[in-house]
Amino acid sequence: MSWYEELDVWTADYLPDMAYEKDVPLRRYTSFRIGGAARRMAFPRSGEELVLLVSRALELGARPFVLGNGTNVLFPDEGVERLVVNTREMNRVCRGENENEIIAECGASMANMAVFAQKEGLSGLEFAHGIPGSVGGGVTMNAGAYGGELAQVIESVTVLFPDEGVRTLNAGEMAFSYRHSLLTERPEAVVLRAAFRLQPGKPEEIRKKMDELMARRKASQPLEYPSAGSTFKRPEGYFAAALIDQCGLKGLTVGGAQVSEKHAGFVINRGSAACADVTALMAEIQRRVKAQTGVELEPEVRVIK
């Protein structure tokens, strides 16, 4: 019996109320709108269900991959022979026990978390309002924008380490740096939830700041096209988009993938891009930038096999 047939039986017995689907097109669940089918996709509703599911999937060799909003990942056109664990049902955000604290589950969107904080009169997450990812992915990569990043406001993170169990780490233990954390080096680890320590503020002033940042984002970024956001990390001392623009690469196209003419830091799907188009275009950008400037660009987008 294959791993997925065994998992079919197990989920029916132990997680009968959890949504569980077969041969799911991944393009539906990624911001690039690219990707073949996942052999199986599960939608746990709680940390307990997720821990139980991932533990069993590992035992069966299902190579579970935990997917949030799918904003920083690219799946191959032939799909993946593994279990994709979709956290969309784990989207709760609430006040914490400590003053000025909120708790967000891994599947909550960064935007919804920022709006929750704003309505509660808590400041510190304004920068996150326009970031399209989920809390789990955002914490893992220390997401940020416009001078803010999650490391500035995180109090603790509860993580499933398959070989150690569930642990709660404080901000110092997370070893945050630019678009990096301890979890970047531990891809098997899964963020379950995070606690954020914010500052009191006036809801209307917080809302105004959020709207200003969103207006800047809409004016400068190609939000009308599918993409994974910033394609490359910022090299030390440089801006990736400026280097790409400097090299004359705006509009460069491979198949259905293109360097945005609005923002050179974005590779966009013009409507028919394949995974191979995007990866080939990224490689060509890296090659030309390296040749012309000497700077090596590091991808921010993860290609999942």
What name fits each language-model region?
Residues 16, 100, 153, 295-297:
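Residue-level signal for beta-strand positions within conserved beta-sheet cores that form or flank
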Residues 60, 67-69, 153, 225-226, ...:
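Short, basic and Ser/Thr-rich N-terminal targeting/leader segments
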Residues 74, 79-94, 98-217, 243-245, ...:
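C-terminal structural segment of proteins
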